[in-house]
Amino acid sequence: MSEFEVSNEYKLQTLNSRLEQLNVEGWHNEEAKTVNIALGNEDEVQRLTANIQIIKQAIVSVQEQITALNE
């Protein structure tokens, strides 16, 4: 629990914004991965694949926070 008083409305707004940012970042990584697959750049493909997995985990975490605030 935070020591700071922030309204649930503001928290939800911030978390939804973060969720959108994560989805955009994931999409950018997928696009870059597609290009690097075509170029045969395996090291970059592996790095981007790892980034995509981290972003997916972050999305799940943010979605859980949103769900908890909506309960």
Q: Predicted regions span which residues?
A:
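Amphipathic alpha-helical coiled-coil segments
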Residues: 22-29, 51-71
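Short E/K-rich amphipathic alpha-helical oligomerization segments
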Residues: 20-50
